[in-house]
A protein has these predicted regions:
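Extended, folded cores of ATP/NTP-driven motor/assembly subunits in large transport
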Residues: 1-404
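Hydrophobic anchor at the beta1->P-loop junction of P-loop NTPases
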Residues: 441
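Conserved P-loop NTPase
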Residues: 726-769
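Hydrophobic positions on the alpha1 helix immediately C-terminal to the Walker A/P-loop
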Residues: 452
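Post-Walker A helix-loop "phosphate-sensing" segment adjacent to the P-loop in P-loop NTPases
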Residues: 459-469
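A short helix-turn-beta junction within AAA+ P-loop NTPase domains corresponding to the substrate/partner-engaging
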Residues: 485-489, 698-711
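P-loop NTPase motor domains
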Residues: 53, 60-79, 90, 253, ...
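Conserved lysine of the Walker
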Residues: 449
């Protein structure tokens, strides 16, 4: 017998003790502050949680790369320890779920919309899987004392985190209370929100940690067990197919039930594995030689070696080649599975569904008879293994049981964006949790861009105290804005609404003198007003001097009272002696006292409303460049004000490509895009002209640096450009090719998942959208 296996069984050999209570079923003997559990005389375990990656929707090449990287991870496992890979399906606790996603009432006129939105969210939650899939890796090792165990786990943990990082998966060590929560949530389904554990408090009171996690009662029958009012059954993989698809684990864990699947891995040192393989090959060759000798003694000199002997020899040679030339390791594996249900009938039906799924892959699950308690302790991430149904595998054949499927996005206190097409779970994202919360919504006309933007605007206004500012060149948002109590500001040469281009708050300068920053803005404005030509050094000096002069009184009054206007600025220019000043004054006359003087008057609209929509549909060609600059500067004013109040600002710019047609507004927008994050603001660009957008290097950089992108149905040329820029696989591309409105891909940080967002039509909110 292989030495590794002999030593392992010797280490794990324990005297059987009949459990006197439910606590005795739990095989943990001691717990430590750093998440290490003692699970035997000299055995310690530690659990690491790793995140899912987009394996199911990756291209063939990417899948191969992930598979090889996962094989590398398995190869790196220490042969002196046992590794348990666990997939845990747990149902979301309805109370926690509702607290996370439902919008609280505020006692204002918008409560009717909040109630309606909450009703929609609850319907979506009921129709969704409502299952969260957690993935763990538990390492258990024999050490003389806890200090040795700590040193070992510190070394192994760093390697694990690095390997998972190369896969694109985030791996973290679990603390003591996090590990105990796994067992509590399994044993006490429905009581998830009641878990509270403080190790110091527990020690002080002399309580056992097991009291916090164990169920009220446990009964073990021949082929199932009862845990409180729930039923459970442990299965094991009895027979493996010669060829197994990499989707098997995903299909087995796709059942919409509380369940766990564990793969126990015992790596064998390569020298020992090679020696064992050589001995086995020698044994097969000896059998063949003996068979031929017997045939020769019977004068049967032309007899061919039997097929089964030839096969054995061929397979052993391949196995030896794998170990010696293909960088494979020999592994022992045990696959166990536990699932629970509310009734025995449901349990039997679920068992049959699992057995059918395994048979589809030509594998066979077996029910553990009279071993349910051992099976349960094996499948759960304690770090123990009581089931000995080992199967010898190579790294490659073990890697087929790859635990990855698709990323789910569920941020606490996030916004609903749709449902994951693959896992059927709700996509709840919070842009505030991203490194860069700026966003783009891209898609062909009729793909659902405005609908997606309006959905987010509704959610922000109803669920938070954040401000929302919209730039609307198509007059699409007016109805929604008015219904939500917002202010629509019509900007044109003939409009009665005016925004003062020289509006400035104390916070405008980001801690420095705000006039310095405003002076730069007025220089850009003058360049536009003069006709897009660059200003000379003299002209810039004059503008800077006049800007400081017109703001002096306003600054001395601590930014209170009447703000100067462009008319005051022109009057100041006319006071200057230099001929250049007179030239600038003449050039901007049309925009200060002429027919296009809409931005040279005092602001007469409510720019302090929580929800503001700048309607720029009637802004003519002459006013468009300066109009966009003034609107963007007004937005910057508002953002800096909100920053001082600790309030977030969401900016939505529809048909954003229009801003990139003018150099100054494009550069101003680029600066805004870089700066808003530190101001607690989040900008969203909406466009159907992706190809045009990507012609601008500025826009391309902005898109590449945005961590939140909603891609709906795309035109063929746009798809290719996006695929190159965002590294989208062909399979992922199919989710933005000829799909219905509201379907596509959503990029949240490094996650890229296919989604569908269907909104009920018989609602007030839908009519507003």
């Amino acid at each position: 017998m292989i030495k590794t296996l002999t030593n392992l069984r010797k280490q794990e050999k324990e005297k059987f003790v009949v459990p006197k209570g439910v606590q005795d079923v739990i095989p943990i003997t001691a717990i430590y502050d750093d998440g290490i559990f003692q699970i035997g005389k000299d055995k310690f375990s530690k659990t690491y949680k790793f995140s899912d990656i987009n394996y199911a929707v990756a291209s063939r090449e990417d899948k191969e790369a992930m598979f090889l990287e996962y094989s590398e991870l398995l190869n790196s496992l220490d042969s002196g320890a046992t590794t348990k890979i666990t997939i845990n399906n747990r149902r979301l606790n309805r109370l926690d779920f509702e607290n996370n996603i439902l919008i609280p009432m505020k006692g204002d006129s918008l409560d009717e919309y909040r109630k309606e939105y909450n009703k929609i969210l609850l319907e979506k939650a009921t129709g969704a899987n409502a299952i969260v899939q957690d993935k763990y890796m538990t390492i258990s090792v024999n050490k003389k004392n806890i200090e040795d165990a700590r040193n070992y786990f510190a070394r192994v943990g760093a390697d694990l985190i690095a390997h998972f990082g190369r896969l694109g998966s985030q791996c973290v060590e679990l603390e003591t209370d996090e590990r105990l929560r796994i067992f509590h949530d399994f044993y006490r389904v429905g009581e998830e929100s009641s878990f509270h554990f403080d190790i110091k408090e527990t020690r002080k009171k002399g309580h056992s940690f097991k009291d916090y996690i164990c169920p009220d009662s446990m009964e073990f029958e021949k082929d199932y067990f009862k845990m409180g009012d729930r039923y459970g059954r442990v299965l094991f993989l009895r027979e493996y197919a010669s060829y197994i698809k990499d989707s098997m684990v995903a299909e087995l864990t796709d059942l919409n039930r509380n369940l766990m699947m564990s793969i126990d891995v015992v790596p064998v040192p390569t020298d020992e594995a090679v020696r064992e393989a050589e001995n086995r090959l020698l044994g097969v060759e000896t059998n063949i030689t003996n068979w031929q000798r017997r045939q020769n003694s019977n004068n049967n000199f032309s007899a061919t070696v039997p097929y089964d002997m030839e096969q054995q020899k061929k397979e052993m040679k391949e196995f030896l080649d794998d170990l010696t030339t293909r960088d494979q390791r020999m592994m022992f594996a045990v696959i166990t599975f536990v699932h629970t249900a509310d009734s025995k009938e449901q349990l039997d039906n679920d068992t049959e569904a699992l057995l059918t799924t395994a048979r589809k892959h030509l594998c066979q699950f077996g029910v553990l008879k009279f071993q349910q308690v051992d099976g349960l302790n094996t499948v759960m991430p304690f770090g123990v293994r009581k089931i000995d149904t080992f199967r010898t595998l190579t790294t490659e054949s073990l890697a087929v049981f790859i635990p990855f499927r698709v990323q789910d996005i569920f941020h606490e206190n996030g916004i609903y964006y749709g449902q994951n097409v693959i896992s059927k779970n709700m996509i709840i994202a919070d842009r505030k949790q991203l490194l860069n919360g700026n966003s783009f919504i891209l898609g062909v006309s009729g793909g659902g861009k405005s609908f997606a933007a309006k959905g987010e605007i509704e959610n922000v206004i109803l669920s938070s105290d954040s401000d929302v500012i919209i730039i609307d060149p198509e007059r699409e948002y007016s109805q929604l804005v008015r219904a939500l109590g917002g202010e629509v500001i019509h900007i044109s040469a003939t409009s009665q609404n005016h925004i003062n281009a020289m509006d400035m708050t104390k916070e405008y300068g980001d801690g420095a003198n705000p006039v310095i920053l405003k002076s730069e803005f007025i220089m850009s404005l003058c360049e536009q007003l003069i006709g897009g030509s660059n200003l000379g050094a003299k002209q810039k000096s004059i503008i800077d001097r006049c800007t400081a002069s017109v703001y002096r009184t306003y600054q001395q009054n601590n930014y209170q009272g009447e703000v100067p206007t462009l008319q005051d600025f022109r009057a100041e220019l006319l006071k200057q002696d230099e001929p250049e000043a007179q030239e600038i004054a003449l050039a901007i006359e049309l925009f200060t006292s002429g027919s296009l003087n809409t931005f040279a008057k005092h602001t007469n609209v409510d720019t302090n409303n929580r929800l503001i929509c700048y309607d720029i549909l009637d802004l003519g060609k002459q006013l468009m460049p300066i109009g966009m600059l003034v609107v963007l500067d007004s937005i910057l004013n508002r953002i800096t004000q909100n920053r001082a109040k600790g309030r977030n600002t969401f900016i939505f710019i529809d048909e954003i490509y229009l801003l990139f047609q003018h150099e100054y507004s494009a550069n101003f927008l680029f600066t805004l895009w870089k700066r808003v994050r530190k101001y607690g603001a989040y900008a969203t660009g909406i466009t159907q002209n992706v190809d045009d957008l990507l012609q601008s290097h500025t826009a391309r950089t902005m898109l590449a640096n945005s961590e939140f992108i909603i891609m709906l149905n795309q035109a063929s040329t746009d798809r290719l450009e996006l695929a190159k820029l965002l590294n989208i696989s062909d399979l992922q591309m199919s989710y933005i090719t000829n799909v219905e409105a509201g379907h596509g891909l959503i990029k949240v940080g490094s996650s890229l998942v296919p989604f569908a967002n269907k909104f009920p039509k018989n609602t007030k909110l839908y009519k507003l959208m």
